[in-house]
Structures are given as structure tokens and as C-alpha cells.
Swiss-Prot record:
Location of the protein in the cell: Membrane
Protein's name according to its UniProt entry: Defect at low temperature protein 1
Organism: Eremothecium gossypii (strain ATCC 10895 / CBS 109.51 / FGSC 9923 / NRRL Y-1056)
Segments traversing the membrane: 14-34, 44-64
Cellular component aspect of the GO annotation: membrane
């Protein structure tokens, strides 16, 4: 059997009449008690009976209200959490239901279109993983921590006198990175002072600004760092560390690369002067 559709005005009218009848029958008890007690000679007893009847009526109404609230909440808990009321029985209006279906399909299409960004998303401070977004440039390794990389470069130069694995000078403890760098290139006429100051400013901004390093600033910092190394190799011979032996296989390979770069630089200078 199909469900009977009752008009809204009929349901509201029936509910109003039912509530009025309930209130009328509920008021009969206190009115009758007050009338009977008023005919009795004892005033204290009359007052106690009236107050008791009023309290009993109040407790009854409160219990009914809380009971209805608890029943309503228990019924609401039976509804599935992921249930979306868009069926024909939930939305009898065909036009509204069709519009909702259309918007849901549109949202599904938008979610598919926006699942992959048009451009590579690079958050400040860290290079993205290799598998996210689309294949971008391979200039930097995945998950590279920009600030940690800058700190390692500065600490190696400050305490070991090594700039990008090229042994350059005897470090002087107690000097800042900027002072150490200015002292190193003070006698080098090939170094552009503006680029040196830009390099130092970038370093101090990256280390002490308190904000994550952007990819552009980090790349510019590395470009200037490589440029300073090339300038220093034009006038300073790359020597081995004071110990005379590399500390590891990595240091040995680094010194070999430094000598290769230095020899190439000398060849380029001789060719240009010829």
C-alpha cells in the first residue's frame, strides 16, 4: 500500500487541536483540587494540597517533555551518518531533486579536474617529493631542506674554511660568516662586491628572518655561492687540508674536482690572454 499524502494544513490543524485537548484535560485536575480544597476549613492543609498538585503537574509535564526529547534523539541516531536525503521520498519535488543531482555531478567533475594542479606546487622551505604534481625540473633533489643546506654551507666555511667542498683558507674561530667571507675575498679583485653583499644579505635573511626559505631565494643563494667559488679559484690555489690527507673518500673526490676546476680556469685565462 502506498503512503497517503496528507495536506500540510490538515496535519497542523490536527496537531493544534490535539495539544489544546491535552492542555484542557490536564487543567481539570488542579482546578478540581483547588475547588474542593477551598471548601475545607483548614487553610494550611488546603495550601499544601494546592502546592502539591501544582508540583505534581509540573513534574508530569517536564517528564513528558524530556521523554519526547530522548525518543527524538534515539530516532535520529538510527539514521545512517552518511545518508544523503536526495531520494524521491525525501524530495518529492522533481525539479529540486534534478537540480541537486546536477550540482553533485558538477562537483564530481570539478574534483577530478582540480585533483592535479596546473603548475608545480612548491612550498617554502622544502623541495616537493618527486612523485607529486607533474614532472618539474630536476635542478634540486626531492625533499631538500633549504635552510639546513644553507646552514651546512655556512658552518663548513666558518669552522673549516671550506666553501662548497673547496678548501680555501685557515678558519678563524670567533668571526661571523659575513666577516669570514669578507676577509677571504678582500684581496680578490675579481669578486664583484655587489654580488658579495647580495650573497651575505641573502644568507642573513635565510638564517635569521624566521620565515621559510623560498625556492627562488635558495637558487639565487646557490648561484652566488658557485660564482664566489669560481672567482676565488681565479686568484687562489686550492690547497689540501692542513692534515695533508683527505678525511674521507668524499673529501678526496672533492679535492680532485677542485683541482680539475682550477686547471680549467687556468686554461681559460691563458686562452683569453693569448
Amino acid at each position: 500500500m502506498g503512503a497517503v499524502n496528507i495536506p500540510t494544513w490538515a496535519r497542523h490543524s490536527f496537531a493544534t487541536v490535539l495539544i489544546l485537548l491535552l492542555l484542557a484535560f490536564s487543567l481539570i485536575l488542579p482546578v478540581d483540587v483547588i475547588r474542593r480544597v477551598s471548601q475545607m476549613p483548614h487553610e494550611i492543609l488546603n495550601t499544601a494540597i494546592i502546592v502539591g498538585a501544582a508540583i505534581t503537574l509540573l513534574i508530569t509535564f517536564t517528564s513528558l517533555s524530556f521523554g519526547r526529547l530522548l525518543v527524538h534523539r534515539s530516532c535520529m541516531q538510527d539514521i545512517p551518518k552518511r545518508y544523503v536525503p536526495i531520494t524521491e521520498r525525501d524530495l518529492p519535488n522533481t525539479r529540486i531533486r534534478g537540480e541537486i543531482y546536477h550540482k553533485l555531478e558538477h562537483c564530481k567533475q570539478l574534483a577530478h579536474d582540480f585533483s592535479t594542479p596546473e603548475t608545480r606546487v612548491v612550498h617554502a622551505g622544502l623541495e616537493p617529493p618527486a612523485h607529486v604534481d607533474h614532472c618539474g625540473d630536476d635542478m634540486l633533489p626531492p625533499l631538500l631542506d633549504y635552510q639546513a643546506c644553507v646552514k651546512i654551507i655556512a658552518d663548513r666555511f666558518k669552522f673549516q674554511g671550506i666553501l662548497l667542498n673547496k678548501y680555501m683558507l685557515e678558519p678563524k674561530l670567533g668571526m661571523t660568516f659575513a666577516a669570514q667571507l669578507r676577509r677571504t675575498v678582500s684581496e680578490n679583485d675579481c669578486v664583484d662586491r655587489n654580488q658579495l653583499e647580495e650573497f651575505i644579505t641573502l644568507y642573513e635573511t635565510i638564517r635569521y628572518s624566521g620565515h621559510p626559505v623560498t625556492r627562488g631565494k635558495f637558487i639565487r643563494f646557490m648561484e652566488l655561492c658557485l660564482l664566489l667559488v669560481d672567482f676565488s679559484l681565479l686568484t687562489h690555489r686550492v690547497d689540501t687540508p692542513p692534515s695533508g690527507e683527505p678525511s674521507s673518500t668524499t673529501d678526496s673526490a672533492t679535492n680532485f674536482n677542485a683541482h680539475v676546476l682550477y686547471s680549467r680556469t687556468e686554461e681559460s685565462i691563458s686562452q683569453s690572454s693569448a
